[in-house]
Amino acid sequence: MRRIVNSTYVTLDGVIQNPQNWPSVGGFTDDGNQIQTKLLGRCDAVLMGRHTYELFAPVWSARSGDPLSDGMNSLPKYVVATALTDPQWHNTTVIDHDPIETIRELKEQPGADIVQYGFGRLSHALMAAGLLDELRLWLHPFFVGSGTASDLLYRAGSSGSFELADSTSLDSGITILTYRSSAT
């Protein structure tokens, strides 16, 4: 069975929203790019919610000529959204009905892992359904110092149990914490 691997940027104070506005995104240094490219290379699909799609599509669709951009653009992308009717990013399929069951069926199909970007309602629903197998937190070494409850990694009512599988420190000061679901 395929695995769902979530890759998310988070600050020391737990903020996950709008990393493009952070003082330093920092994940796209050479060592960060290599890790992102390696993860993408072991996956054959990308999964995201609408908010992440709206941030990613204009950026990634305009890039090409490197393994990370080419991988993001060529892989099938699945977007959970009810209000997205005509996705412009190449190779995008909208999941607009019964997303958990649809994703469960995707996971049961033969193939490589599925990478999921962003950590919002979709991630919490995947975790609750036991479908999130691995969590990669790119821990950025600063506090944003502001935000609302929806800007945080933690959401009321969410629970899940993970075990640390790996940690990698980048030259930028970012630490990538890889956790695997205890239920898997």
Features from the language model and the residues they span:
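Enzymes that bind and transform nitrogen-containing heteroaromatic metabolites
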Residues: 1-184
